[in-house]
């Protein structure tokens, strides 16, 4: 076809489509209609429409006649439109409807007589008080049910029993005080009941949930982890509850569990986690731990113990954690960090030690570290021996410490350093500090901070960018360069010692 004819044909189709599109709506060739700020559901929606999206309108009531002729409709989304009521059987004749989303409205109950082919039902942010099994009758294909942020007070088997194919259930942010079991949902994989009023979970709730993989009870009032959890579980979230103890012996059958979240509870100790042999993530931040958990699972990759009261870091807690990649110990009271405590963690890339009581950078850290956060300690020095093996380090955060000088040799030993954070330290801006600046500029490191606290005539200047300091120290830098060149110049009568010295220099850059 000639390009001109193709253009004219496309133009005519577009004009025809726009002509059939209701006001305040946009229609596209993908059979999708989007409407905004309506007072009622518009008439004249194309009969071929598969997706109808209406948002931020004032549609108080939906009725059967609104959908007459929309026999191809697959997705209907009504968002933030003030809808309070829906006529009985409004959606019943929409046999092709697969997704129904009625978010942020004022519905008090689940719409009745929903179409049998429905797969996704989302009624979040309404005013639904109760669920009745009759509302879900015939929904054998429903896979996703979301009822977040409503006013539901309880869950029972009779409410959900018609949903034989349900795979995901989310009822976060309700007023649920009780759950009655067993919930007969054999295909359920994901269940979230966050931010409710639960104090106790009966042991029989999970009897028929043998395919459940992800479970969250975060933000409730539970004092213990529910018993008889399904063996299929991969992830368990119990943050923001009232746990004081975790009985791992009641969880040892969870051989597939890989993620356990216990942050923001009242745990004073964690012991026995090694029984969860496949655990890769353990988060216990914002508890009352005074020591690191002993005997952790050997496959652990992430351990978050931030915001506790941990004082010491020693080698025994980490001797079997060869797969550990991320360790968070920030906001504790760590004052003792045993040299080489993490040497067995041969894959550790991220170590967070901000806001502790460290006086120096820990010695013999893993060579694999890419990020090291030491903000807000009492570190006074940055020595070459503390950093010499960290050839992979890319980010070093030393904000808000007591460092006044930098060893430029320590910086030379960090070939991959890309980001260095130095603000909040009392820098003594002598000319020798500019050697460190030259090293950092040569490697292209992004440096944040570095304001001089001394001497008095340089207070407030930045030793990384101040031209004034550079001019004052120009002679010192030239002398340093000449001294360096003199040391490098070989003596003909002692070539063997030169080679030896060069090898020694190379050793400074190698990883043992």
Curated annotation (Swiss-Prot):
Residues 1-19 form the signal peptide. Residues 20-44 form the LRRNT domain. Coiled coil: none annotated. GO terms for biological process: extracellular matrix organization; negative regulation of transcription by RNA polymerase II; negative regulation of transforming growth factor beta receptor signaling pathway. The keyword Nucleotidyltransferase does not apply. Residues 503-512 have a biased composition (Acidic residues). Residues 474-512 are annotated as: Disordered. Residues 474-484 have a biased composition (Basic and acidic residues). LRR repeats lie at residues 45-69, 71-93, 94-117, 119-138, 139-162, 164-185, 186-208, 210-232, 234-253, 254-276, 277-299, 301-320, 321-344, 346-371, 373-389, 390-413, 415-442. Keywords: Glycoprotein, Leucine-rich repeat, Repeat, Secreted, Signal. InterPro entries: Leu-rich_rpt (IPR001611), Leu-rich_rpt_4 (IPR025875), Leu-rich_rpt_typical-subtyp (IPR003591), LRR_dom_sf (IPR032675), LRR_TM_domain-containing (IPR050541). Belongs to the small leucine-rich proteoglycan (SLRP) family. This is Nephrocan. It comes from Mus musculus. The gene is Nepn.
